[in-house]
């Protein structure tokens, strides 16, 4: 929509607002949750493969169910363990061992200041993280970043999402819930494919070059820069 003011920022979390060693994070996550979430008779390697397939089921979700439902439906079929049996085990993992994964992350002050300035200027903020996790896991990662859940008007979790990035449905679901148009929004993220796919809908993209995933040369039409450049950009934005 020509002339519409962009007053909303969608932010990715992992690798964007929360800098992290993605390989170390995923390894610790899959090993930890597999030990907690499958029965002892299943070998750890087989269990990790089951959890990975359940995650892929969420990534490929067609919108017919929530990501949470896609995850547990797949895991139940592969492991023979019901959701009712799995949930307490996974809750224990997120309440305990998951917290140690914080060691794979750190606080980026420029990212914290970026969010703070946007809030002060009146912009609406959405945490558009890949919705593969329950609320407790996502909320903990927000805290690890130096931010808090109240910084955001909306946060995507696996139980309130029916798609994953880069599906257009992921973005349109949030837009519809918040009565927004894509032309009102920026998308900030470090993934050249998943995050910048929002531009096809009308978002303005900012590809964060720190912790970049994908090939920067294949993305055109968006702003590109590191944390300090992003901070300078928002400092120069008008108040809403």
Regions found by a protein language model. Give the residues of each.
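A metal-dependent, Asp-based hydrolase signature
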Residues: 52-95
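Substrate-recognition element of Asp-dependent hydrolases with the DxDx(T/V) motif
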Residues: 92-94, 102-104, 111-143
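Short histidine/acidic/glycine/proline-rich micro-motifs that form metal-
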Residues: 17-19, 57-58, 129-133, 160-161
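Asp-based, Mg2+/Mn2+-dependent phosphohydrolase catalytic module
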Residues: 1-9, 116-117, 130-132, 139-240
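Residues at alpha-helix caps and immediate loop-helix transition turns in enzyme cores, especially N-
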Residues: 22-25, 107, 137-138, 167-170
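Active-site neighborhood of HAD-like aspartate-dependent phosphohydrolases
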Residues: 2-50
